[in-house]
């Protein structure tokens, strides 16, 4: 399971010109699910995302987690993160989970974050989305489990 996380001052996602998710300060999370992923991997990744200390403390040091900083999370499904780009000039998506498996783990990820007390907004699984953000830093990490 893959989470590309970006620290943002704000972010939103639109589907058919309608805003379906919007946050102020926090994390924009692009979530990719691979075939071998399961609930255990999802819980491990979700815990890492919400606990990862990438927000500045009072001394300007990256030392606070999303929860400690009081930030929100905007989660967007993105199967292209599971692409194999090692050969040729066209990505292969053979490692990506089926839409059914990916949607199940995407929804479980969202539920898990909410149960941990994190304000969580979402995109729409499988939709053509337009994502807008104002990066903070920029600070971007690729987390995998």
Curated annotation (Swiss-Prot):
Homodimer. It is found in: Cytoplasm. It comes from Shewanella denitrificans (strain OS217 / ATCC BAA-1090 / DSM 15013). InterPro entries: Daa-tRNA_deacyls_DTD, DTD-like_sf. It catalyses: glycyl-tRNA(Ala) + H2O = tRNA(Ala) + glycine + H(+); a D-aminoacyl-tRNA + H2O = a tRNA + a D-alpha-amino acid + H(+). Its EC number is 3.1.1.96. A motif (Gly-cisPro motif, important for rejection of L-amino acids) lies at residues 137-138. It comes from the Bacteria. An aminoacyl-tRNA editing enzyme that deacylates mischarged D-aminoacyl-tRNAs. Also deacylates mischarged glycyl-tRNA(Ala), protecting cells against glycine mischarging by AlaRS. Acts via tRNA-based rather than protein-based catalysis; rejects L-amino acids rather than detecting D-amino acids in the active site. By recycling D-aminoacyl-tRNA to D-amino acids and free tRNA molecules, this enzyme counteracts the toxicity associated with the formation of D-aminoacyl-tRNA entities in vivo and helps enforce protein L-homochirality. This is D-aminoacyl-tRNA deacylase. Pfam families: Tyr_Deacylase. Belongs to the DTD family. The keyword Hydrolase applies. GO terms for biological process: D-amino acid catabolic process. GO terms for cellular component: cytoplasm.
């Amino acid at each position: 399971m893959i989470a590309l996380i970006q620290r943002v001052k704000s972010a939103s996602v639109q589907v058919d010109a309608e805003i379906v998710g919007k946050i102020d300060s926090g994390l924009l999370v692009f979530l990719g699910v691979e075939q071998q992923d399961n609930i255990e991997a999802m819980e491990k990744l979700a815990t890492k995302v919400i606990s990862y200390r990438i927000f500045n403390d009072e001394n300007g040091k990256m030392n606070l987690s999303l929860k400690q900083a009081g930030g929100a999370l905007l989660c967007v499904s993105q199967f292209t993160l599971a692409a194999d780009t090692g050969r040729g000039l066209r990505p292969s998506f053979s490692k990506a989970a089926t839409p059914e498996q990916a949607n199940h783990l995407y929804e479980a990820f969202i539920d898990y974050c909410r149960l941990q007390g994190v304000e969580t907004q979402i995109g729409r699984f499988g939709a053509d989305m337009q994502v807008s953000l104002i990066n903070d830093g920029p600070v971007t990490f690729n987390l995998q489990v």
